[in-house]
Amino acid sequence: MRIISGKNRGRQITAPSSLPVRPTTDMSKESLFNILNNYFYFDRVVVLDLFAGTGNLTYEFASRGALSVTSVDNHQGCADFIRRTAGKLGYSQVSVIKADAFVFTKHCKQQFDIIFADPPYELADIEKIIDNVFEHNLLKPDGWLVMEHSKAHDFSQHPQFYQHRKYGKVNFTFLVNMTDNSDSSEEEEEDQEDGR
């Protein structure tokens, strides 16, 4: 995986092959951050990275100067790898929590500007993550929840739905903590996938 922008732009990170992960592709990650860049100043955001895996998104947010990034994964190997890598890269704003994302989002008391969730595509009931985020008020006003998912899921009828983007086999649904979603849109972008 590669850090696309920020102080560690171009840095390649190789995760152990033993980790049970499916990292977000560089192409889809770059497209995602191009969208976020239009709405957020990264040096002002507080981020939660759920199902963090190798920490791919965690490092990208940290490289771009995020105020803090909380990285949550239930796999000990993943949590240890993120902690080591963040330390090597000097990301003091990164905190790593080994926890089940469903349980964590039920009990977390902090609010975030951006929450990114990349559950395993085959995982059942991933909509519970969305429910937990909004029921437990984990987003700041105008904060965003970004769900990465397969085409099997459609969250366009959720009251906080904002937009949907597709890059190859990667789907992103954006949900926003706001009361007026009149500008919600469904956008499809078909691109070649470059691997995760």
Predicted regions, residues:
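Class I S-adenosyl-L-methionine-dependent methyltransferase catalytic core
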Residues: 1-196
